[in-house]
Amino acid sequence: MTIPYLLLDDARAGRARLYRDHIRRDTLAAADLDQLDALLARGWAEGLHAALRIPYEFGLALMELAESAPPLVLDWYARLDQLHGDAIDAWLRDQHDGAPAGLLDLRFDTDRAAYARTIAAIHELIRAGNTYQINYTLRATAASYGNPIALYQRLRALQPAPYAALAWHPADGHTLCLSPELFLARDGDHLHTLPMKGTARATGDIEAAKAALARDPKNRAENTMIVDLLRNDLSKIARPHGVSVSDAFHVARHGEVLQMTSRVNARLRPGITHAAILRAAYPCGSITGAPKRITMQYIAALEGSPRDLYTGALGYIEPEEMRLNVAIRTLQITDGHARFGVGSGITIDSDADDEYRECQLKAAFLRHPPDIGLIETLRVENGEPQQLDAHLARLAASAAALGLPCDAEAVRTEVIARCATAAQPHRLKITLPRDGTPHIELAPLDAIARDVLVCEHGEALPDRDPLRRHKSTHRTHLDRIWQTAVAAGAFDALLYNQSGYLLEGARSSVFLQIDGAWHTPPLALDILLGIARARLLAEPALIGTTHITESRLSRADVARATRICLANSLRGILTARRIARP
């Protein structure tokens, strides 16, 4: 979907608000926040529906801690649908084709040693008496493959969240938010917040683990600090004696994590505007620490990159009603690049190793792969699997990237045992499913001619698809392409991307001789790291040259090539002649 939309999704209760028919986007700098209510009144008078998107750094400018910061965003939609139960899943399913979607190579920007050094620095700041708790956060990056809406639907099932959101806007890319935390809820003159502080792993006897977390002195102390901060924030806009705390130290499960919350309530003074509420409370104290202002200064110095929407807020706003989440557990995906933030509250009692593990735990739900596996296909000669080391190395690397378990040495042992009696050439196929249990198939391999035909596939593939770098079980479309080519008398079909560059064959790597020099497409085009390709680059003499250049090659380059070679591990190096499309 490439039209702006917003789904505010209570996946636990099975209800959602779907905003569509985007009309316009208003933005407000922090210095202009008092104009918010006038903007709201104008949009509501037009019969439109308002949604808020507030980056964390807006709060820095609001507190005059930054000269410039990204603005508050107010999106206006003409249509609002209330969805319930299966209708939410049905709408999500309608937005994608069911192909696998996930993340590859999820990496944190801070290793354990660097993290420990920062925690030591935070402890020094706390000892100096200027802060009691600092919410220190890390960034993770990954390559995203498949439809982000399909990824959201899968993550939503893994970790149903009460304050989730899914959105797309050309200025933002895709936002996939699985937040368990409420920032602000307004109903008339009643306002409440549910700050989340206190974390434990959801394992073993869950009820016992919940009770243990609720009793834990360190987590209760963290929670109490933030509750006191938010009581102070809300007292700025509440009636005298109008702030109270209820449901203190409540523990709930969110996927693999247990989280502690306490509820802070406020009765608003007459005439309090939406702008005044945000000015008093934003950003949520649970993601800053205490005291808020100086701790935000420390955060700006300690963290290596902006948080952006992460730890900001997403939600809706109506004349007498407002719901804003704390935008944690939030993926932002732009052009296949995914960003994710995760952090924890650091106090004087915090242990760096424990806190780092907590960050890993909070991100664990991202590492669950979809229903996808890996394939390796290799040639067996005289009972010997050819280039087995290279295939196992690729299998292990791809498994790590996709988050699949893989015992490469166990696979090696099974492969060697299966091949021992294969005197004639055989085809060996290794399939590694999501659970990491390998499946080995061995079949006789018929000989083919060394001179073959190759055709061109007419449909362009996406420019960016990092899953193409891995030989996954999601390859029915590729099998269909080469099988169509075979039916037309060819060995394979050449694939091109939407920019017109040659990628590879549906089952082979491609090498072209142009003006006497040999070329092959670069891995940067998201092509398979072919075993035969790597061997030819290392041993170019195999095709009678001293060097092969990785180049972006167009259809015109293919047309003027004087020689074409196709290569894969099963068939080796083949000389090809180009024919028309099948």
Language model: regions and residue ranges:
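Helix-start/capping segments and mature chain N-termini
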Residues: 223-226, 256, 260, 326, ...
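Extended alpha-helical targeting/anchoring segments
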Residues: 1-382, 493-497
